[in-house]
Regions:
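Beta-hairpin "wing" of winged helix-turn-helix
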Residues: 57-74, 79
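Amphipathic alpha-helical recognition patches that constitute DNA-binding helices
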Residues: 11, 15, 75, 79, ...
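Accessory beta->alpha helical hairpin/"wing" motif in late/C-terminal subdomains of nucleic-acid enzymes
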Residues: 80-84
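Short beta-strand/turn micro-motifs at beta-sheet edges
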Residues: 2-6, 66-67
């Protein structure tokens, strides 16, 4: 699990929303899911994750309830709200458009100009 890739501003929230969209998770589970879906390219520090989770919950993008984790410990499980699903869709569309534009720009050749 390397941290070779750096997070761009605003991407942590998007990654959290995506991770939770795949199923309810507790905080540590979200860290592991982000590592998994990024092919172990991204490692999120707990010190960054938990303030982001609190912020997303305050914004109404995540809902949380207490439950029992797989190792029988009390944990707060997060799930997407309807507003969270909308935000994820909007942010995903925006990033996909940006990737398309940047790919075209970076692949430009003198012959195309």
């Amino acid at each position: 699990m390397g941290s070779d890739a750096s997070l761009l501003p605003g991407t942590l929230d998007l990654l959290i929303l995506k991770a939770v969209s795949l199923g309810p998770l507790h905080g540590y589970g979200i860290l592991l899911r982000i590592e998994q879906i990024s092919g172990d390219a991204l490692t999120i520090e707990q010190g960054a994750l938990y303030p982001a989770l609190a912020r997303l919950e305050r914004q109404g993008l995540l809902a949380a309830e207490w439950g029992t984790s797989e190792n029988n410990r009390r944990a707060k499980f997060y799930r997407l709200t309807a507003a969270g699903r909308r935000r994820l869709r909007e942010e995903t569309d925006g990033w996909q458009k940006l990737v398309t534009v940047m790919t075209a720009a970076l692949n430009a050749t003198p012959e195309e100009l």
